[in-house]
Amino acid sequence: MDEIDKKITLLLQEDARMTITEMTEHLHLSRPSVTERLKRLQDTGIIEKYTARISLDAVGKSIQAFLRIENLKIPCKKFEEKIYEEYRILECYRVTGESSYYLKVAVHSMKELEELIDFVIPFGTVKTSMILSSPIPYRPIITD
């Protein structure tokens, strides 16, 4: 990736709906050049997909937490299959250390959080940390 490719990825991370015409204006490049670069970035897997970020607060899921799963009672693959369909689990990280997994969850109410914890408890020890705020809710990836 050269500097222009890096600029393209930054522009798209800020606004995935940016048109090729708008990119040509920002980058001072021709339309065919930008189109070719975009295709290459997609073909090589650097750009995986175009998405929208949804405000959890705006959709009523203002209660967020991390669930740390320790002492897993079933094989990792089986655990991952069980939690995959649970839509309230936004992110899942397999980690080293005392915990096996960190789950980032978002729910409408404390009752719903309790239900989600009850769903996960059979798989291992669950420790919960409520998210108070997120000083860095999203940061564009800067490529070196």
Question: What does each model-identified segment do?
Answer:
Residues M1-D144:
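A compositional/biophysical signature of low hydrophobicity enriched in polar/charged and small residues
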